[in-house]
């Protein structure tokens, strides 16, 4: 199996470094990741500026100032030969739950893989203490997948509790929960006494109802959320069509 491995924490993050080292024991892994932290870059693609890359002696590639999506795009369309069987994004040090899927570069990289016709995994650890546990879980998952491939192409957003393995209860297939955002903007001053603004802080107020990714993680289950790359709201096409027909006739 050929794996394209990327992330949004940057190529030097222990999440991608430890995972790539483990996976290279039994898979053909091409690492191509941003040169620095690109968290929160979502599905940003660089189209107005050229991208520079560096290839390390072990074959890993970094894209200077590139986004996770740039990395996956370049990897699939240029650098990776043969083409990947799977795109893996992570391991992110910090969960990507609920509304995070709209902002996360980890999820964005997996989305880009699916846009380009490949099954993709976005993998995040709910913290940074038990990274070795997360690496072992992903290793076993991909080893099983090697002999039991999916029948369809999927995007799976996988979040792993930051706990010792013995306390993780299993897997839950989940839906995205919701964060009750506090629309907080923090105004400050820079060294030149000019206004600067911070978005945050993050809220701790979540919808943790049964069946959500938040509920699974809170109860020490691995959360697996299938995502869609097609954002069309098919259920509302007829009602919206009727509204616009009335608008056009008015």
Swiss-Prot record:
<feature type="binding site">
    <location>
        <position position="8"/>
    </location>
    <ligand>
        <name>a divalent metal cation</name>
    </ligand>
</feature>
<dbReference type="InterPro" id="IPR002828">
    <property type="entry name" value="SurE-like_Pase/nucleotidase"/>
</dbReference>
<dbReference type="GO" id="GO:0005737">
    <property type="term" value="C:cytoplasm"/>
</dbReference>
<feature type="binding site">
    <location>
        <position position="39"/>
    </location>
    <ligand>
        <name>a divalent metal cation</name>
    </ligand>
</feature>
<protein>
    <recommendedName>
        <fullName>5'/3'-nucleotidase SurE</fullName>
        <ecNumber>3.1.3.5</ecNumber>
        <ecNumber>3.1.3.6</ecNumber>
        <ecNumber>3.6.1.11</ecNumber>
    </recommendedName>
</protein>
<comment type="function">
    <text>Nucleotidase with a broad substrate specificity as it can dephosphorylate various ribo- and deoxyribonucleoside 5'-monophosphates and ribonucleoside 3'-monophosphates with highest affinity to 3'-AMP. Also hydrolyzes polyphosphate (exopolyphosphatase activity) with the preference for short-chain-length substrates (P20-25). Might be involved in the regulation of dNTP and NTP pools, and in the turnover of 3'-mononucleotides produced by numerous intracellular RNases (T1, T2, and F) during the degradation of various RNAs.</text>
</comment>
<comment type="similarity">
    <text>Belongs to the SurE nucleotidase family.</text>
</comment>
<keyword id="KW-0547">Nucleotide-binding</keyword>
<dbReference type="GO" id="GO:0008253">
    <property type="term" value="F:5'-nucleotidase activity"/>
</dbReference>
<dbReference type="GO" id="GO:0046872">
    <property type="term" value="F:metal ion binding"/>
</dbReference>
<dbReference type="GO" id="GO:0004309">
    <property type="term" value="F:exopolyphosphatase activity"/>
</dbReference>
<feature type="binding site">
    <location>
        <position position="9"/>
    </location>
    <ligand>
        <name>a divalent metal cation</name>
    </ligand>
</feature>
<dbReference type="GO" id="GO:0000166">
    <property type="term" value="F:nucleotide binding"/>
</dbReference>
<keyword id="KW-0963">Cytoplasm</keyword>
<dbReference type="InterPro" id="IPR030048">
    <property type="entry name" value="SurE"/>
</dbReference>
<keyword id="KW-0378">Hydrolase</keyword>
<dbReference type="InterPro" id="IPR036523">
    <property type="entry name" value="SurE-like_sf"/>
</dbReference>
<keyword id="KW-0479">Metal-binding</keyword>
<feature type="binding site">
    <location>
        <position position="92"/>
    </location>
    <ligand>
        <name>a divalent metal cation</name>
    </ligand>
</feature>
<dbReference type="GO" id="GO:0008254">
    <property type="term" value="F:3'-nucleotidase activity"/>
</dbReference>
<dbReference type="Pfam" id="PF01975">
    <property type="entry name" value="SurE"/>
</dbReference>
């Amino acid at each position: 199996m050929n794996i394209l491995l990327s992330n949004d924490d940057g190529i030097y993050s222990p999440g991608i470094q430890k995972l790539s080292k483990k996976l290279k024991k039994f898979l053909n892994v091409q690492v191509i990741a941003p040169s620095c932290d690109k968290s929160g870059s979502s599905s940003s693609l660089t189209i107005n500026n050229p991208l520079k890359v560096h290839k390390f002696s072990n074959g890993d590639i970094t894209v200077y100032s590139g986004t996770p999506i740039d990395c996956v795009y370049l990897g699939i369309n240029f650098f990776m030969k043969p083409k990947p069987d799977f795109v893996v994004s992570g391991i992110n040090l910090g969960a990507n739950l609920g509304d995070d899927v709209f902002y996360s570069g980890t999820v964005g990289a997996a989305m880009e893989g699916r846009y380009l016709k490949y099954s993709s995994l976005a993998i995040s650890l709910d913290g940074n203490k038990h990274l070795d546990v997360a690496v072992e879980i992903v290793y076993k998952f991909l080893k099983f997948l090697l002999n039991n491939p999916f029948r369809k192409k999927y995007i799976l957003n996988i979040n792993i509790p930051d706990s010792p393995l013995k306390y993780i209860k299993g897997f839950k297939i989940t839906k995205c929960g919701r964060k009750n955002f506090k629309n907080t903007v923090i105004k400050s001053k820079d060294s030149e006494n000019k206004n600067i603004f911070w978005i945050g802080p993050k809220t701790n107020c979540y919808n943790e109802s049964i069946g959500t990714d938040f509920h699974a993680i809170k109860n020490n289950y691995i959360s697996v959320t299938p995502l869609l790359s097609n954002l069309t709201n098919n259920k509302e096409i007829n009602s919206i069509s009727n509204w616009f027909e009335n608008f056009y006739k008015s």
